[in-house]
Amino acid sequence: MAKRIIYNEQARRALERGIDILAESVAVTLGPKGRNVVLEKKFGAPQIINDGVTIAKEIELEDHIENTGVALIRQAASKTNDAAGDGTTTATVLAHAMVKAGLKNVAAGANAITLKKGIDKATEFLVEKIKDHSKPISDSNAIAQCGTIAAGNDEEVGKMIADAMDKVGKEGVISLEEGKSMTTELEVTEGMRFDKGYISPYFATDTERMEAVLDEPYILLTDKKIGLVQDLVPVLEQVAKTGKPLLIIAEDIEKEALATLVVNRLRGVLNVAAVKAPGFGDRRKAMLEDMAVLTNGQLITEDAGLKLENATLDMLGTSRRVTINKDTSTIVAEGNEVAVNARCEQIKKQMDETDSTYDKEKLQERLAKLSGGVAVVKVGAATETEMKDKKLRLEDAINATKAAVEEGIVPGGGTTLAHLAPALGDWSSSNLSGEELIGANIVEAALTSPLMRIAENAGANGAVVAENVKSKPVNDGYNAATGEYVDMLSAGIVDPAKVTRSGLQNAASIAGMVLTTECIVADLPEKKDSSSAGGGMGGDFDY
């Protein structure tokens, strides 16, 4: 296909146009008074949403070059989402501000490479400062505050996540389900999560989120490699008759068998998903045995004289629900407490008997996985559209609280970044010079952009609010919900330090890449043929 090649200023301006479009559509959602965005869906009802990264993923422009700009900023949002699970809108606003200021300087003749160096040095300085400012989380009250802010000021959600963390521990698994009622409820059940995702993306049942969700599945556990599809056929036939889904957890599934499973899944013959077993060697077998206990099934292993081709339905485990994405699998089981407790006691005995610190650590890990359970939040809403929005907000809140537990919290509402701007100005003027200093100044100017946008969305003057906040003590900021200047930590307006840090780093990274772009190669738009006259309908005849 023919390509279009654009150089220099023209290339950067085209990228900028795409970036402007995406940044504006995402920025309207920022802050407690941020608005919603409606996404049109090809099938089903439109989706009303307040989540930056979801909006960013939906935007596709007709112009290929502008679309490249959209994709770059989308990357800042999705990388922040992968690292911290929240703060995607902030990352987008920061990246946009840095790109706009940087392009002005490049157009005026500044050297883009030196500017990028300045941006990188300023970012390193700020990351250290954010670390110094962060306060470790000590009680469930702080966890609740974090969840509340991330869920768009929903106190009920914040409290529920704090309760869930109390029950399953800070490392515990919190899973989301669509509830059957109007209210959102919390339930703690047996279950476990392990770090292996689906073997093939074709197993995903929800292609938008790339997740496989199996309700009340049978679970086949085996410690052997499945190479021949003939070994699986008897089990597949038995499960297909019941009409229930099947999850296969095995050491590995080789090409032929995997292809057969995928084809059956795509044709709708059997809802099946396959996952590699976690761990290695003896530890893998022990973890599979733990899963067998949890799901009330048997581990099909030749050590116990069991062969895959002779497996029957009563050897398979069952669970209430299994959720699998590309990296992790979560099994939510129920009604098997006695066996699980007995297995936990057995692991504790092994821990007492072993002298090796490594073995103790691994046994402790298994014990935590088995005994910790899974907190299931059942999302309640009046309509499906509200349910989807609520689910995304809850997901942000869960991710934000986990990030807060990891790296602590900082004052929220864009306050921390705004307060760091003067400190960065002092540091850069004494440590950097020339165009590197200009690069640092670009970052300094961008630091107030999230706060300004939050204020503007609440109907205040962003520039005035930003200057007022800078002149106040470090923890003081602007509460956009009430329009007052308050101590953010006391008011419970907090952000996880990890979210603030990731957003800043990803924004600076993308800004640096855009500024140093000198050429774009993109597809030429396809020419549409003007439709020729149909057969038997002579083009030039008069009728």
Swiss-Prot record:
Q: Name one GO molecular function term.
A: ATP-dependent protein folding chaperone
User: Which Gene Ontology cellular-component terms appear in the entry?
Assistant: cytoplasm
Q: Name one Pfam family in it.
A: Cpn60_TCP1
* Organism listed in the record: Prochlorococcus marinus (strain NATL2A)
Q: What reaction does this enzyme carry out catalytically?
A: ATP + H2O + a folded polypeptide = ADP + phosphate + an unfolded polypeptide
- The name this protein carries in UniProt is Chaperonin GroEL 1
Family matches, as InterPro entries = Chaperonin_Cpn60_CS (IPR018370), Cpn60/GroEL (IPR001844), Cpn60/GroEL/TCP-1 (IPR002423), GroEL-like_apical_dom_sf (IPR027409), GROEL-like_equatorial_sf (IPR027413), TCP-1-like_intermed_sf (IPR027410)
Localisation: Cytoplasm
> What binding partners and quaternary form does the record give?
Forms a cylinder of 14 subunits composed of two heptameric rings stacked back-to-back. Interacts with the co-chaperonin GroES.
Its taxonomic path starts at:
Bacteria, Bacillati, Cyanobacteriota, Cyanophyceae, Synechococcales
Positions that bind ATP: T29, L30, G31, P32, D86, G87, T88, T89, T90, G413, N479, A480, A481, D495
> Which family, according to UniProt?
Belongs to the chaperonin (HSP60) family.
Enzyme Commission number(s) of this protein: 5.6.1.7
User: What is the annotated role of this protein in its UniProt record?
Assistant: Together with its co-chaperonin GroES, plays an essential role in assisting protein folding. The GroEL-GroES system forms a nano-cage that allows encapsulation of the non-native substrate proteins and provides a physical environment optimized to promote and accelerate protein folding.
Keyword Nucleotide-binding in record: yes
Principal subcellular localization: cytoplasm
Which GO BP terms apply? protein refolding
Listed A to Z, the keywords are: ATP-binding, Chaperone, Cytoplasm, Isomerase, Nucleotide-binding
Recorded hits in HAMAP family, A to Z, give: CH60 (MF_00600)
